[in-house]
Amino acid sequence: MAKIKRIITTLVRLLVLGAALSATIVMVTSHDSAEVLNLSFDAKYTNARAFVYFAITNAIASGYSFIALFLSFSTPLWHLVFLLDVFMTLLLTSSISVALAIADVGKKGNSHAGWLPVCGQVPEFCDHVTGALIAGFSAAVLYLVLLLFSIHAVLNPKP
């Protein structure tokens, strides 16, 4: 049974690592430019603090997932890993929430505030952001699954 737990945990951590790393890479490489009324502007992820937060959070989650791959269930650090899994789940959930809110404003605009949608002018940027958000959402869901599995492992430590 312990071997099955280790295999499942390793598999889910690898999936999280792939999803979070993909979200980071796709978000960091998102860039497009447009010209409107003879004015040129660049759209990149650094223009929105929410996208920067999203990229940094996913980078942290992928780094932590990589390190956690090498820890054993039998080490005393496993309870710390459990607490860090909770923290990473919350961190990823907050980053996907804030990035989705900004992406929604970018796509639809906000008529009450007078903000126009920008995805019509910079579609490549919006496509990159959408891809990053899909990968980030996958990472958050996978971390939730990993957290539930970790809760089960902590509450039922039987081999």
UniProtKB/Swiss-Prot annotation:
Subcellular location as annotated: Cell membrane
Membrane topology term reads: Multi-pass membrane protein
Q: Name one Pfam family in it.
A: CASP_dom
Q: Which domain of life is it from?
A: Eukaryota
**Cytoplasmic compartment spans:** 1-6, 74-86, 152-159
The main location is membrane
| Membrane-side (Extracellular) residue stretches | 28-50, 108-130
Known glycosylation sites? 38
Glycoprotein: present as a keyword of the record?
Answer: yes
Indicate the quaternary assembly. Homodimer and heterodimers.
How is this protein named in the record?
CASP-like protein 1C1
Q: What is the lineage of its organism?
A: Eukaryota, Viridiplantae, Streptophyta, Embryophyta, Tracheophyta
